[in-house]
């Protein structure tokens, strides 16, 4: 079955036609495009997700960029969130914290997780990792969601 799509409406149409979830349409398109197995495609995406998690876990608030303009703010946001005074609340506070940490790691030339772009390097990792942590979601479900975001 051919899984060519050019828009979200194409994705929805294919998912409905084949009675499969959206993420599987994207996975099958990847399988066709790269000529790999379903398992290889899923494992590649899992490795990308794990790289995002590793970048988050390896954040070091003491490292400052060469310009001195980036570094340490992720740690400040962490302390602010931990204080319980955050106006943004649990999930949104966590997303902002992780996004800043990813951006700082990028600026300090640590692991660069450019998703969706280098200019917004922390957005997808921050949202996904925070959701996984805050909502106690499984890694497999997060990898499936990553296919949809692709």
Residues covered by each model-derived region:
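Generic N-terminal targeting/processing segments that precede catalytic cores or assembly contacts
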Residues: 1-110
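Glycine- and small hydrophobic-enriched segments that form the cores of compact globular domains
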Residues: 87, 116-121, 133, 144
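Amphipathic, well-ordered alpha-helical segments in soluble domains
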Residues: 95-98, 123, 148
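Short coil/turn connectors at secondary-structure junctions
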Residues: 107-110, 121, 137-143
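Conserved phosphate/anionic-ligand binding catalytic regions in large, soluble enzymes, centered on
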Residues: 109-127
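Alpha-helical support elements that line or immediately flank enzyme active sites
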Residues: 125-136
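A structural-propensity feature for long, helix-poor, extended segments
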Residues: 143, 147-150
């Amino acid at each position: 079955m051919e899984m060519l799509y050019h828009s979200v409406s194409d994705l929805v149409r294919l998912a409905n036609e084949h009675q499969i979830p959206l993420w599987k349409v994207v996975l099958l398109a990847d399988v066709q495009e790269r000529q790999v197995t379903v398992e290889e495609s899923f494992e590649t995406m899992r490795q990308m997700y794990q790289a995002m998690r590793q970048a988050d876990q390896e954040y070091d608030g003491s490292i400052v960029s060469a310009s001195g303009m980036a570094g340490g703010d992720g740690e400040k946001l962490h302390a602010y969130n931990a204080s319980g005074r955050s106006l943004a609340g649990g999930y949104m506070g966590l997303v902002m914290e992780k996004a800043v940490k990813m951006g700082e790691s990028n600026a300090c030339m640590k692991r660069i997780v450019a998703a969706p772009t280098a200019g917004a390097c922390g957005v997808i990792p921050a949202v996904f990792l925070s959701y996984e942590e805050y909502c106690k979601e499984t890694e497999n479900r997060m990898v499936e969601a990553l296919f949809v975001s692709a």
